[in-house]
Amino acid sequence: MVEPLLSGIVLGLVPVTLAGLFVTAYLQYRRGDV
């Protein structure tokens, strides 16, 4: 019963983590560009 929950958590965290890294990199790029 743990695997479905674990896979759900992973599938939920991966996009959020990638989005967070993309946003931080974008903000740093914008801040460094100006």
UniProtKB/Swiss-Prot annotation:
Transmembrane domains' residue ranges: 5-25
Membrane topology: Single-pass membrane protein
Any one Gene Ontology BP term: cytochrome complex assembly
Any one Gene Ontology molecular-function term assigned to this protein's record: electron transporter, transferring electrons within cytochrome b6/f complex of photosystem II activity
Keyword terms of this UniProt record: Chloroplast, Electron transport, Membrane, Photosynthesis, Plastid, Thylakoid, Transmembrane, Transmembrane helix, Transport
Compartment list: Plastid, Chloroplast thylakoid membrane
Domain of life according to the entry: Eukaryota
Main location: plastid
Entry's Gene Ontology cellular component terms: chloroplast thylakoid membrane; cytochrome b6f complex
Described purpose of this protein according to its UniProt entry: Component of the cytochrome b6-f complex, which mediates electron transfer between photosystem II (PSII) and photosystem I (PSI), cyclic electron flow around PSI, and state transitions. PetG is required for either the stability or assembly of the cytochrome b6-f complex.
Cross-referenced NCBIfam families: PRK00665.1 (NF001907)
Family statement drawn from the similarity comment of this UniProt entry: Belongs to the PetG family.
Quaternary context: The 4 large subunits of the cytochrome b6-f complex are cytochrome b6, subunit IV (17 kDa polypeptide, PetD), cytochrome f and the Rieske protein, while the 4 small subunits are PetG, PetL, PetM and PetN. The complex functions as a dimer.
Stated name of the protein: Cytochrome b6-f complex subunit 5
Annotated gene: petG
